[in-house]
């Protein structure tokens, strides 16, 4: 697939990037663009030069595919649901629903019928995206290489753009429910007078609370990305070893990842529910300390 280990690693860890290169740009093959062109990046340098508007086609495609699989599975189970002896798919879906419902009841202290479906969607979707790591590391990138694609990653959660997209959605929901439940004045007051209930400490409180608010999506995104990306790198490094050594290291690492993949989906879901629960709580404040 690649002539050197560096090319092999680059092919597996670089995303399939589509974006716009400016006129006069010299490409990796030595050709010079006569005009600004939307194209697929051939190297990491080209991907960087495409700038902010570049799109990771592999991350986007696999995310949508896993989302579609989630919808089809749960829709099929719902349509085939019966009061009699349930089938295997119905059993699996009911287990997921009951598990997530129990987590939400224990964690979420407000009243919102949308939180449990949201938590279920996040848990199953992230789990499905993580589970792509169970596919042997060379299979799909190898097919992509035969098709002439310069790079290809199949795990959306090993791409920071994917995890930050998820966490940004959660962050928007946190702000939405904070303003909806507490009102603009109530939410602003909470930021200004927590943790110290004194007018002279409002700037310090705002700094702490806004910083804490911004770290929520950062922690969600970086935790998921860090665990998935690190696992991806280890699998790729193991694949570079001689065949007789690969089994010695790959089997225990794969077994370990059987636990990591659902665990990271669970952590992302629980933290999302915790943050949304906090957004629904109107803490209130006593009279200002003079």
Curated annotation (Swiss-Prot):
Residue spans crossing the bilayer: 54-74, 115-135, 136-156, 164-184, 201-221, 233-253, 254-274
InterPro entries found in the cross-reference section: ATP_syn_F0_a_bact/chloroplast (IPR045082), ATP_synth_F0_asu (IPR000568), ATP_synth_F0_asu_AS (IPR023011), F0_ATP_A_sf (IPR035908)
Cited CDD domains: ATP-synt_Fo_a_6
This protein's GO CC annotations: plasma membrane; proton-transporting ATP synthase complex
Bilayer disposition of the protein: Multi-pass membrane protein
An MF annotation (GO) of this entry: proton-transporting ATP synthase activity, rotational mechanism
Compartment(s): Cell inner membrane
Key words, A-Z: ATP synthesis, Cell inner membrane, Cell membrane, CF(0), Hydrogen ion transport, Ion transport, Membrane, Transmembrane, Transmembrane helix, Transport
Principal place of residence: membrane
Biological processes per GO annotation: proton motive force-driven plasma membrane ATP synthesis
HAMAP family, sorted: ATP_synth_a_bact
Subunit structure: F-type ATPases have 2 components, CF(1) - the catalytic core - and CF(0) - the membrane proton channel. CF(1) has five subunits: alpha(3), beta(3), gamma(1), delta(1), epsilon(1). CF(0) has three main subunits: a(1), b(2) and c(9-12). The alpha and beta chains form an alternating ring which encloses part of the gamma chain. CF(1) is attached to CF(0) by a central stalk formed by the gamma and epsilon chains, while a peripheral stalk is formed by the delta and b chains.
Role description: Key component of the proton channel; it plays a direct role in the translocation of protons across the membrane.
Family: Belongs to the ATPase A chain family.
Protein name: ATP synthase subunit a
Primary gene name: atpB
